[in-house]
Amino acid sequence: MDILLINRRGSRLFLHIDIDSFFASAERSVNESLKHIPICVGSRSNLEIFNKKRTYIKLMNDNSGAFVTPVFYSDKKKTFESYFVDEIEGRKKIRGIVTTASYEARKCGVKTAMPIAQALQLCPSMTVVPSNYPLYHKLSHKIHAFMLAHIPKVEQYSIDEFFGDVSGWKEEEEVYAFAKELQAKILAHFDIPVSIGISKAKWIAKLATESAKPYGVYEVKDIDAYIENMPIKAFPGIGKGFQKRLGEHYISTLGDVKRHKALFESWKKPGIQLYGRVTGTDNEGISTRSERKSIGISRTFDVIHDASEIKRRIMIMARHIIYMVMAIEVNPTSYYLKVGYEYGVKVKKTLTVDRVFSEKLFKSMLAQMYDEIVHLNKGAIKLTLSVSNFSAQHKKTLSLMDFDEDNHENKLSKEIQNLRERFGLDIIKTGDEL
């Protein structure tokens, strides 16, 4: 049972810690030459998994949780030329997108998700660094452990964001100095800059971090005054669709939200929750448990018209999901497949089966789903697979008719998993992957 701590004045106190330009800062922490110059970290779809030769792809799962997906990576050294540049019919083409840009690069107009070729036109002197997800996961894991040693209650919200509850541990007049001290310690220990927001409400603390960036600390003492003229798009969770919906009611600021309580209550639970978060009246606490609810993988590639090659790629991606499912020992009962075609056309299929998970079952269900999809006279450019709805491997919850056979296949899958964990993810492949 969680015990709610409050300070002597009876109010709660939250910190929101956000690592500044995390991937770029992580690269700078291991390479001094990248400091104080415009840089960006770039990435592109990892198509090595479709290589018919062994690629020695490994799984990075040290920092797994509901907030972050597992990363499949290769030990192969990446350079700008080898990673971002493709040669097509004698012409070189720069591929990939910006994952994170340093503040120096942002001043040139470089933004997240921008094509790297476009970013280099805006900032020709910018250094582009290939992504190194194992580094980011390990750093995030270490920083999380560091937070736990300095704050009584910590929630990891994403790979580069943390909430801390210091209620009853620090008084209001002490918390700003504590945040500054914590910020300095993280920089000294990890060479990583962070920004920190402080508030009596959890989600206002997160909003305050945006006011603190870069490398600052911002404390919200009067929530009503702080949100009064804040645009609704600034609040986490209010996307473009909801902004449009609010605009229809002439709501453009968070102060306007506060004045429309009845409207939000009419939208039931989602509206009531959002109203509480925006106004700081939600009384939401820290969540220290983070359970994964789904596992997925997607890949984007050049146009493919060959249906057999698309199916082969689905089976290869399935092996990667199987590896993760077996590694964290869950039993998914819902399977999802989406095929993205040219010109923005997408076709998807979902299947739910109350059976014990195994490699044989999952691949056979995917083959069935792919065959049932209405295939268009267009080339495929993206595949997405995921599994969800985890259940216990128990006869009471799963199909009795198939339980014994499925259990046998599950044990076989575990034996294959042991080999893959020892010798690599691609040590054993099925015929439909070749």
Report the location of each language-model feature:
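Residues that scaffold, gate, or flank divalent-cation-dependent active/transport sites
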Residues: 1-159, 163, 281
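DNA-contacting surface of Y-family translesion DNA polymerases
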Residues: 4-9, 16, 242-380
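Short Gly/Ser/Thr- and Asp/Glu-enriched loop/turn motifs at secondary-structure junctions
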Residues: 157-161, 199-202, 330-334, 378-382
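A generic structural motif
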Residues: 161-166, 386
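Catalytic palm subdomain of template-directed nucleic-acid polymerases
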Residues: 164-183, 250
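Long, highly charged, low-complexity intrinsically disordered interaction regions
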Residues: 174-231, 394
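Acidic, metal-coordinating catalytic segment for phosphate/diphosphate chemistry
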Residues: 351-434
